[in-house]
Regions:
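Catalytic machinery of carbohydrate-active enzymes
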Residues: 1-364
Length: 364
């Protein structure tokens, strides 16, 4: 097969943070196949991130939420939409499909199997936890947290013929935009953790206390997030009037610009922490029920491993309980909304986060 004839479909039907963690895998494939057509299949909401990743990708979108419940296919309009999309995939004549997903649930595995078969590609590569009988090349899935998610996805790309590359997720810095004018010294706070699991969200009044302490130390708090999360930004702004509220006010390239200029970035398990890591910006990430070994921002270490003599610029703050993580543990989906008390998250005190911020600022 000539390089120009190679057609690769990368499947990542996930949120922004998960897509960013796939950047090394995408880079691995583009490095190995510079002349190939590489298409990236993502949900509509994450498509804008592809431009920030670079790598000369064509982007296809698939509204996976419409088909999360397979009984939805019984609706005539949904079934027709799925058939039309399947025909679109078939007409693209892909040689290889790279599935950058764990096959965690039977329904999820069925969805990936359908997408792969719709393409009629000869090669289908992905993680196998026992549900991957449709794969032609398999990477053994050792369970969530046995490897970092970025490492898992890079392993899949390598199994598809990808080149060895730096495993740290990166963004195309030429695509980063300056965004709003900000003071010279500021700290970014992202209080929300996205729509999938609100159980990862630390209490907003504690973010207000962190913002107050940062302001007292001469760092202007800058709050970022989506327009739908604006009430969290308003709460922090009311607590600390000097706060600059950019909730819903930036594009992704502008958000990257805001993060790039920050002295430190503070928040929960979500996209902005991964973006800070990709831009090599100091960061403190608060974990509750989700799996920190799987999803910690790349290069971030447990806060107890950070001291003023270290070179780490990212710390993870958490309380390790026997029941934690309860979201994406082993091979199970677990509990997206955590337990009713969310003890692991609520035990993280403001003082602990401020201590982590102090350690990272001194170390970096």
């Amino acid at each position: 097969m000539s390089a120009a004839d190679r057609r690769i479909l990368i499947v990542k039907l996930a949120d922004l943070g998960d897509l960013l963690l796939c950047e090394p895998a995408i880079r691995s494939l583009r490095t190995a196949f510079p002349a190939a057509r590489i298409d990236l299949l993502v949900p509509p909401a994450t498509a804008p991130l592809a431009h920030l990743l670079g790598h000369d990708l064509s982007v296809l979108t698939f509204p996976k939420s419409l088909f999360d419940n397979l009984t939805a296919l019984a609706r005539p309009n949904r079934f027709a939409q799925a058939v039309r999309f399947g025909l679109q995939l078939r007409r693209a004549h892909y040689n290889t499909v790279v599935v950058l997903h764990h096959l965690t649930t039977p329904g999820g595995a069925t969805k990936q199997r359908w997408l792969a078969r719709a393409t009629s590609a000869a090669n289908v590569v992905g993680l196998d936890n026992g549900r991957g009988n449709f794969l032609t090349a398999r990477v053994i899935d050792l369970g969530f947290g046995a490897k970092h998610e970025a490492t898992y996805m890079l392993d899949v790309a390598r199994a598809a013929g990808g080149a060895p590359v730096d495993p740290a997720p990166q963004v195309d810095r030429a695509s980063v935009q300056r965004g709003p004018a900000l003071p010279a010294d500021y700290a970014v706070i992202y209080p929300a953790t996205g729509p999938y699991s609100s159980a990862r969200t630390w209490p907003v009044e504690r973010y207000g206390a962190v913002a107050s302490a940062l302001a007292a130390d001469g760092l202007t708090p800058v709050v970022v997030g989506s327009r739908g999360e604006a009430q969290l930004g308003a709460h922090i702004r009311n607590a600390v009037p000097s706060t600059i509220d950019l909730m819903g006010a930036t594009s992704l390239p502008e958000l990257a610009g805001v993060v790039t200029g920050a002295r430190i970035v503070v928040g929960g398990d979500s996209f902005v922490g991964h973006l800070a890591a990709a831009l090599d910006v100091p960061r403190v990430t608060i974990f509750g029920p989700s799996n920190r070994d799987a999803w910690r921002p790349w290069g971030s270490v447990d806060v107890d491993n950070v001291d003023i003599d270290s070179t780490f610029n990212g710390a993870v703050v958490y309380h390790d309980l026997p029941c934690q993580p309860c979201l994406y543990a082993g091979y199970r989906l677990g509990r997206p909304e955590g337990c009713p008390t969310r003890t692991c998250l609520n035990r993280v005190a403001v003082a602990e986060v401020l201590q982590a911020i102090d350690r990272i600022l001194k170390a970096s």
